[in-house]
Structures are given as C-alpha cells and as structure tokens.
Amino acid sequence: MNLQHHFLIAMPSLQDPQFKRSVIYICEHDEKGAMGLVINKPLEQLTVETILEKLKIKSPSRDPAIRLDNVVLAGGPLAEDRGFILHSPQEGFASSIHISPETMITTSKDVLETLGTSGQPKNLLVALGYASWRQGQLEQELLDNVWLTTEADTHILFNTPIAERWQAAANKLGINIFNIAPQAGHA
C-alpha cells in the first residue's frame, strides 16, 4: 500500500489536539515510513506576506494584484520552524520533489522569491512543520481506525476553504464524517 498523494482524514474519535479533525496530505510513503502536511490547521495571524516580510524577501517584480494574504498552515508537530510549499508543478526550484502529476513540494527559499509575482506557481499552500510516521506506524494507525484514506483531490487541497476540508475530504468517500461511529469492527 502506497498512500503518497492521498489524504488521511482523522476519525471523529481522534482527540489528539495536533490531529483532531485534521486532513493530512501524504507527500511521501514507502517502506521506511511516511511524511505529510496537515492542510486544514491555520496558524493564527500568520500569512504568506508576513513570512516574506520576516525573511526579508522582496521581489522587484512584485505584482500588487496578486494577493499574499493566504494563511500559513500548521503542517505538523515536527520541525515547526521549517517551511514547506506544496504547489502545482513548476520546474526551476532548487529543492523540489514531484509528488503526483498535479503536485510537488518545495523546501528551498527560491520558491518564496516568486510569490507575489507572475512567476509563482498557479496553486500553492505554505505550511510550517510536518507530520511523519516511522516504518509500519501509519499502517498500524490505519488498522486501529485512527484515519480514513482517500486519493487526494487538488480542488480540496488548493481551493476548498480551510474550515471545510475535513468534511470535503470525507465526502469524497461518500460519507458524512459526523455520522461515523467511534468504534469500528474488522469483519
């Protein structure tokens, strides 16, 4: 089972404040473990523009018509000072990995220098921190009914309002997440 380019949808019974009602986009999943970004937990009072100001990144070709008030997301509890830009594919950045034909992740500063310019990726989200699982841990959490999974949907990823992403991801499975029983059997 490879869950790269899938959503993990927290079951209603998950009460850990880091992951309660979360949707995680899985960026990498292999025999060594998994890594993903929480895509529905905004960091209060932190926008892309604020990040650019703190890092003193000013582009001479900044287009004032391009909004930079997108909220920055709490990508997970690990390396919360490290930035991850999830975006539609665009070549030319120093440290990017293709996740799927519709998404790639970049961790190098050069992508930040394109934000607010005509050269920025078409779709993007910025997250600080990430979530990860060691070998076999995610698979065990799935067996323990901690998460639902579904293939990722770039509309949910980039266009659905943050507060609606948990329900929208569950809707892909044809379910109302609020109607799920906290305990499930394994028949």
Curated annotation (Swiss-Prot):
GO terms for cellular component: cytosol. Gene3D superfamilies: VC0467-like, VC0467-like domains. InterPro entries: AlgH-like. It comes from the Bacteria. Signal peptide: none annotated. It holds the Pfam family DUF179. Belongs to the UPF0301 (AlgH) family. PANTHER family: UNCHARACTERIZED PROTEIN YQGE, UPF0301 PROTEIN YQGE. This is UPF0301 protein YpsIP31758_0835.
